[in-house]
């Protein structure tokens, strides 16, 4: 199974993402730059890592979402290719219209960097199939604009159709996200956006491997 990591100016978690994918799959992902207009046909998973693309000017992810490479990402997503955006990557997916809702400033108005607990609220997706329903996993967060918001109608649809796949658990919501939402998928289930960083927990020797199953599930391999 082959993966690709999108590179944009200001992203700073691409090395972590590449290292995680290389460790899990045994091969380094291909990298695709902002000005590229296509993504290799044999790619099974596209990842947009975290950071501060274009310095978070205008809005987090707003400029990145309008780069040529994002049209290629849209085309792949429309064909059913798995797409995952983490932190700034989640913000970019929202700005690109690949996921519903918006991410606002943290309720504290401060940058938050700590470990949180996540509840797996839907284990019946290609991303989350390596977990059990209701399982609590550990995951670090590091963001200033992670406060997820959507209007009442959108929230009702997300909750009713099982599109909320991760929720901040046990009072660990770090940003004020509505309904404690930490990660969502699109209606088709092949696009995931989440604020926590699973790529930083894929080896037990480095603090834990709770994030490993997420990548393995998306790629259809054994964790």
UniProtKB/Swiss-Prot annotation:
Keywords, comma-separated and alphabetical: ATP-binding, Cytoplasm, Glutamine amidotransferase, Hydrolase, Ligase, Nucleotide-binding, Purine biosynthesis
Active site as annotated: 87 (nucleophile), 197, 199
Entry EC number(s): 6.3.5.3, 3.5.1.2
SMART domains per the UniProt record, alphabetical: GATase_5
Subcellular location: Cytoplasm
Gene Ontology MF annotations: ATP binding; glutaminase activity; phosphoribosylformylglycinamidine synthase activity
Record-annotated Glutamine amidotransferase type-1 domain positions: 3-223
Pathway connected to this protein: Purine metabolism; IMP biosynthesis via de novo pathway; 5-amino-1-(5-phospho-D-ribosyl)imidazole from N(2)-formyl-N(1)-(5-phospho-D-ribosyl)glycinamide: step 1/2
Reaction(s) the record says it catalyses: N(2)-formyl-N(1)-(5-phospho-beta-D-ribosyl)glycinamide + L-glutamine + ATP + H2O = 2-formamido-N(1)-(5-O-phospho-beta-D-ribosyl)acetamidine + L-glutamate + ADP + phosphate + H(+); L-glutamine + H2O = L-glutamate + NH4(+)
Major place of residence: cytoplasm
Disulfide bond entries: none
GO biological process: 'de novo' IMP biosynthetic process
Any Pfam family: GATase_5
Function: Part of the phosphoribosylformylglycinamidine synthase complex involved in the purines biosynthetic pathway. Catalyzes the ATP-dependent conversion of formylglycinamide ribonucleotide (FGAR) and glutamine to yield formylglycinamidine ribonucleotide (FGAM) and glutamate. The FGAM synthase complex is composed of three subunits. PurQ produces an ammonia molecule by converting glutamine to glutamate. PurL transfers the ammonia molecule to FGAR to form FGAM in an ATP-dependent manner.
Quaternary structure annotation from Swiss-Prot or TrEMBL: Part of the FGAM synthase complex composed of 1 PurL, 1 PurQ and 2 PurS subunits.
Name of the molecule in the record: Phosphoribosylformylglycinamidine synthase subunit PurQ
UniProt organism field: Brucella abortus (strain 2308)
Lineage: Bacteria, Pseudomonadati, Pseudomonadota, Alphaproteobacteria, Hyphomicrobiales
């Amino acid at each position: 199974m082959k993966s690709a990591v999108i590179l944009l100016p200001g992203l700073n978690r691409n090395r972590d993402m590449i290292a995680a994918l290389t460790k899990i799959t045994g091969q380094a992902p291909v990298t695709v730059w902002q000005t590229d207009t296509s993504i290799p046909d044999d790619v099974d998973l596209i990842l947009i890592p975290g950071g501060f693309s274009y310095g978070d000017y205008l809005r987090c992810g707003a400029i990145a979402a309008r780069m040529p490479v994002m049209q290629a990402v849209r085309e792949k997503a429309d064909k059913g290719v798995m797409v995952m955006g983490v932190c700034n990557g989640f913000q970019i997916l929202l700005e690109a219209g690949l996921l519903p809702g918006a991410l606002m400033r943290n309720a504290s108005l401060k940058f938050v960097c700590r470990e949180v607990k996540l509840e797996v609220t839907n284990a019946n997706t290609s991303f989350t199939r390596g977990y059990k329903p209701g399982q609590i996993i550990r995951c670090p967060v590091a963001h200033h604009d992670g406060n997820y918001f959507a209007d009442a109608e959108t929230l009702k649809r997300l909750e009713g159709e099982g599109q909320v796949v991760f929720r901040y658990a046990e009072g660990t919501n770090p940003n004020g996200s509505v309904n404690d939402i930490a990660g969502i998928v699109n209606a088709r289930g092949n696009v995931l956006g989440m604020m926590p960083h699973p790529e930083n927990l894929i080896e037990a020797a480095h603090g834990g491997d709770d994030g490993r199953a997420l990548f393995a599930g998306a790629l259809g391999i054994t964790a």
